[in-house]
Amino acid sequence: MSKNIVVLPGDHVGKEVTDEAIKVLNAIAEVRPEIKFNFQHHLIGGAAIDATGTPLPDEALEASKKADAVLLGAVGGPKWGTGAVRPEQGLLKIRKELGLYANLRPCNFASDSLLDLSPLKPEYAKGTDFVVVRELVGGIYFGERKEDEGDGVAWDSEKYSVPEVQRITRMAAFLALQQNPPLPIWSLDKANVLASSRLWRKTVEETIKTEFPQLTVQHQLIDSAAMILVKSPTKLNGVVITNNMFGDIISDEASVIPGSLGLLPSASLASLPDTNKAFGLYEPCHGSAPDLPANKVNPIATILSAAMMLKLSLDLVEEGRALEEAVRNVLDAGVRTGDLGGSNSTTEVGDAIAKAVKEILA
């Protein structure tokens, strides 16, 4: 059983965290000899700009199109600024070219032992468990725009079509139906102001009503949802669906609840994972952390992204769950990087998780 994975380390800590994810995947292959992971490394982001002049070289894109999944580290940094050619353009391009229309970002505690690290009081944070499903290839980030050309005027445009909203709604519904009873769906918009949000709300409502009558959907204005998230996040438990820009913002807000950006994974999918073989790109929610010393970054977000990859793209559900259990066991044992109040290095955390997952699967 051979699985082809393109690795895009990216910039700064990107290589460190992807190295640790590869380490734990190889540990799984050691105890499951029928599984073989083939890793192919390519450039993206600032590293690609330095080497080739473009944030996403053609060979990286073509290799990604042929892979079973893509594992990405982190992109960007102050070195490359905000000029005409920027590292982040590589991310936008690969999402669009690979049709990665749905971004999944879980918000929960990898271990309850981390509750005291949350900026929220434990009694409010405990039990938080939702996934943000963000539409990733439409909306204002891909709309028509005008730069300031000396006239002091610039603008961006938000545009959504019914098929785009239906597609992301079906992804949210699929995820909700994976639990028994099904999870509630929360749809976030700004329908009291924006025409695109009114189309969004209408389409989400009709899609759920006609295609998934067993599910419930509740609509929430994005600003109200942002308040709920810091006041009582468990009220949003279930599946949270929203557009590209709102999803970008609300998922970053949610990411601090578990106490560290170094804990949260993400998946960007091109299709429903109904056979556990959806093509996807997996990356941590944190950035490239250019100021962080070597061997200090928390690799858990990337390792948990690899666990999502095992479950959603590589049809290795048991192994993915084992990896999540290994992470929980290691955290409970107190093996932690500095962002979690520990003193362990990046490689020490990776080593501990690799050992733990082998013990679970042996």
Swiss-Prot record:
Protein localization: Cytoplasm
Residues noted as binding NAD(+) in the record, renumbered to the chain: 77-88, 287-298
Residue numbers binding substrate: R95, R105, R134, D223
The keyword RNA-binding belongs to this UniProt entry's keyword annotation: no
Reaction catalysis annotation: (2R,3S)-3-isopropylmalate + NAD(+) = 4-methyl-2-oxopentanoate + CO2 + NADH
Residues annotated as transmembrane: none
Protein name per UniProt: 3-isopropylmalate dehydrogenase
Organism: Kluyveromyces lactis (strain ATCC 8585 / CBS 2359 / DSM 70799 / NBRC 1267 / NRRL Y-1140 / WM37) (Yeast)
Record gene name: LEU2
